[in-house]
């Protein structure tokens, strides 16, 4: 499709999606006068999908129409916006501003202990993108957008991590390459270590500094790097209704969010067992899952004592790539004999965010995933696993008679999170035993 045809098609799709969103909001009696966003957070999944498609088409239109100077200007605006949000956060300016009232900029400056003239210049810049508002000359109030950064502290934490950690680290990526080369095995020869001039690995620094850990978690949450909720979503799409009264075992990694409680509420006839996997040098869960019917502690790679389950869920991510790949391979080997002895049993493997093939998913989704992948490189010489890499790992677990095989892939729309259905296959047999997840 040539660029002119693309331009027309994308514009038509934007217009159609906008009309459908507007129709939904009117029917749902959404108050359009005081919105933090056009589409409310409780909107149905179908409406959220329309919103996503609209944003994707807007992104494509921007790519088609952007000139080089536009890109430079956009980068300049974003860098200044980040510095302004950091400044407002550092001096707790937003916390000093009432959520539902207007104050003079002079009074806000006195409350915050900052220069009035500088505060006014910063406020008037952020207003241009909808952050804060000036209802009358010299007076400031929250906008729907800025008020969320007060009511949802994780948004402020995410911005502060971006400004204080992620951005300074990213700008040292070239220096790290020049100084260290391709030192992917080192946790300390990183852009992060250059930016902050110390030798502590990033993950160790997070363990030692709760504020850094909190901000890192918030950054992942709001940039699409936290796949724990996505894992729940993709596993909720498995066809559990055909299992009747079967047993389901979930092997849970130290940083994973269990899906068992969610599934147990939806499918009470199933019998769930959670096995908390102890990973060497890894953290452990703060508390057992008291509402789950059965909880076990199991060493990573230890023998799987539950041999009559219909489904085994490996829910090990998120973990650093080296630990994740080793943990997944160890658990696949631990379940090999169980799956070989029971051809009806299936292992469902999830590994958090996976890198897609270039161009294989929506550009907006791919941007988010590759953003996270680069952040891992710069902070810790870490990386995301590729889907094909995970599949090859599964297929490499074998003996002289057969192997583990991926018989189904369940993708979650608009993400790169996937659940792989794995069964034992004897050599010489095709995929005839494959069943839908």
From Swiss-Prot:
Effect of deleting the gene: Resulted in loss of trypacidin production.
Signal peptide limits: none
Transmembrane region(s): none
Key words of the record: DNA-binding, Nucleus, Transcription, Transcription regulation
Tissue localization of expression: Specifically expressed in conidia.
Domain HTH iclR-type per the UniProt entry, residue ranges: 75-144
Subcellular location: Nucleus
Any one annotated GO CC term: nucleus
Gene Ontology MF terms: DNA binding
Highest taxon of the lineage: Eukaryota
Induction details: Expression is positively regulated by the transcription factors brlA and laeA.
One of the GO biological process terms: secondary metabolite biosynthetic process
DNA-binding region: 105-124
Functional summary from the UniProt entry: Transcriptional coactivator; part of the gene cluster that mediates the biosynthesis of trypacidin, a mycotoxin with antiprotozoal activity and that plays a role in the infection process. With tpcE, coregulates the production of trypacidin.
Protein known as: Trypacidin cluster transcriptional coactivator tpcD
């Amino acid at each position: 499709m040539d660029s002119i045809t693309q331009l027309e098609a994308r514009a038509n799709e934007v217009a159609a999606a906008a009309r459908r969103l507007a129709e939904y909001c009117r029917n749902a009696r959404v108050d359009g006068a005081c919105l933090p966003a056009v589409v409310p957070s409780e909107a149905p999944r179908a409406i959220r999908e329309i919103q996503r498609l609209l944003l994707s088409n807007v992104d494509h239109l921007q790519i088609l129409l952007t000139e080089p100077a536009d890109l430079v200007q956009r980068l300049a605006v974003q860098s200044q916006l980040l510095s302004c949000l950091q400044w407002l956060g550092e001096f707790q300016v937003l916390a000093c501003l009432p959520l539902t009232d207007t104050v003079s900029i002079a009074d806000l400056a006195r409350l915050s202990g900052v220069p009035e003239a500088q505060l006014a210049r910063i406020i008037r810049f952020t207003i241009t993108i909808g952050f804060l508002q000036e209802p009358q000359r010299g007076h400031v109030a929250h906008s729907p957008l800025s008020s969320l950064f007060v009511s949802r502290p994780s948004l402020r934490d995410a911005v502060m991590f971006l400004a204080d950690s992620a951005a300074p680290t990213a700008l040292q990526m070239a220096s790290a390459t020049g100084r260290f080369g391709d030192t992917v095995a080192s946790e300390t020869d990183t852009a992060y270590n250059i930016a902050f001039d110390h030798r502590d690995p990033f993950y160790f620094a997070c363990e030692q500094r709760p504020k850094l850990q909190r901000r890192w978690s918030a950054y992942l949450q709001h940039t699409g790097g936290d796949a724990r909720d996505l894992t729940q979503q993709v596993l909720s799409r498995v066809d559990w209704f055909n299992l009747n009264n079967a047993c389901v075992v979930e092997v849970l990694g130290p940083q994973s969010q269990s899906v068992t409680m969610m599934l147990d509420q939806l499918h009470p006839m199933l019998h769930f067992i959670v096995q908390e996997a102890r990973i060497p040098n890894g953290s452990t869960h703060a508390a057992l899952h008291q509402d789950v019917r059965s909880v076990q502690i199991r060493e990573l790679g230890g023998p799987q004592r539950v041999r009559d389950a219909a489904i085994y869920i490996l829910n090990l991510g998120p973990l650093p790539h080296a630990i994740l790949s080793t943990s997944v391979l160890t658990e696949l080997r631990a379940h090999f004999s169980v799956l070989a002895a029971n051809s009806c049993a299936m292992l469902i493997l999830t590994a958090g965010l996976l890198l897609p093939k270039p161009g294989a998913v929506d550009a907006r989704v791919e941007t988010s995933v590759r953003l996270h992948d680069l952040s891992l490189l710069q902070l810790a010489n870490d990386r995301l696993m590729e889907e094909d890499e995970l599949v090859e790992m599964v297929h490499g677990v074998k003996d002289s008679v057969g192997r583990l095989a991926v018989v189904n892939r369940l993708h979650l729309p608009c993400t790169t999170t996937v659940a792989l259905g794995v069964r034992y296959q004897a050599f010489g047999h095709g995929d005839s035993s494959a069943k839908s997840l």
